[in-house]
Regions:
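Bacterial Sec-dependent N-terminal signal peptides
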Residues: 1-25
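Glycoside hydrolase catalytic-domain context in secreted enzymes
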Residues: 18-312
Length: 312
């Protein structure tokens, strides 16, 4: 840069250079070296209400197998969307959706891709109930680690597993997804699964985030019917259904899934006692909770909300 003759010009140049540098300064939330809490607080402070609402939404991607329509699928995804249930194997489709979020949204928040990795991804293992029969949690941890690596290589960041519902009614149709009727067994294998999926560091390219489900009492539905009422006393809640979740949260589970069912009259997805008083206040869980499929609009059917706005 040429030496300027006049001091006034030199000062002006310095001011302009400083302003340009300030404009180019990276936001705290994009600084990988900054503490997580600072990055989160900075990002949230920049978000509009609409952007926050979009981050709470989850769409599906990849259910349309017609390749000619895949571009249309991506067009339907808001750039500010929070997460996708990813049903496909097309890396180009997945990457195009992510590119849209990163480049076409104001803040460039990446999409979280989730999938039901239950008992393996490409390599299939025995169902969870069968795994419990082995009483070999170390082997289950290894199996979940393999599933995590396969899923991550396919573009999945987050699995809706493990299911640790303490199921004691054989009529319930999802008994096979859990680890049986004993709270301790569910706790042990749930923790093993979490360790396998997440490892020591979820930023590892071979790991995925785990999700404890279904919080809570989903398996205790009347007559084993899905989506219906449960009558659970506080003692039964704590003696039978709480222990596996408490163990899973203490083991570092990144997320939980709220259940469809009422818990003695209050829907699981709108239950202040279980979601806030226990999970957040008592256990200090700092991850997030995802509702089960359409469980939030179902609050209308359960008589808990008048419309979708109130349900949300």
């Amino acid at each position: 840069m040429k030496k300027l003759t006049f001091i006034s010009c030199l000062l002006l140049s310095g001011c302009l250079a400083g302003a340009m540098a300030a404009n180019k300064k990276q936001p705290i939330y994009k600084d990988a070296k900054a503490p997580i809490e600072e990055r989160v607080n900075d990002l949230v402070s920049r978000m509009t209400l609409e952007e926050k609402v979009q981050q709470l939404n989850q769409y599906t991607l990849g259910r349309n197998n017609n390749e000619n329509n895949r571009g249309e699928e991506v067009k339907k995804i808001p750039a500010t969307l929070g997460s996708l249930i990813y049903f496909d194997e097309d890396a180009n489709l997945r990457n195009e959706a992510q590119r849209k979020a990163m480049e076409e949204s104001r803040l460039g928040i990446p999409i979280l891709f989730g999938y039901d990795v239950i008992h393996g991804f490409r390599t299939i293992y025995p169902i969870s109930l069968g795994q419990a029969c082995s009483w070999n949690p170390q082997l289950v941890e290894q199996a979940c680690a393999v599933a995590a690596q396969e899923a991550r290589m396919s573009g999945v960041d987050w699995t809706f597993s493990p299911m640790i519902d303490v199921a004691r009614d054989g009529r319930w149709g999802r008994v096979a997804e859990g680890y049986g009727e004993d709270p301790y067994t569910n706790a042990v294998f749930g923790v093993a699964s979490i360790k396998g999926y997440q490892g020591e560091d979820m930023s590892d390219s071979k790991r995925v985030a785990a999700c404890l489900k279904h919080y809570i009492g989903y398996c205790a539905s009347e007559a084993g019917r899905d989506y219906v009422y449960t009558e659970i006393s506080n003692q039964t809640l704590w003696d039978t259904y709480i222990p596996p979740y408490e163990a899973g949260v203490k083991a570092g589970a990144a997320t939980l899934m709220s259940s469809f069912n009422d818990i003695s009259g209050t829907p699981g997805s709108a239950n202040h006692y279980t979601m806030t008083e226990i999970l957040k206040n008592r256990w200090k869980h700092d991850g997030f909770v995802v509702s089960d499929w359409s469980a939030v609009p179902q609050l209308i059917d359960q008589g808990h909300a008048a419309d979708r706005k109130e349900a949300a």
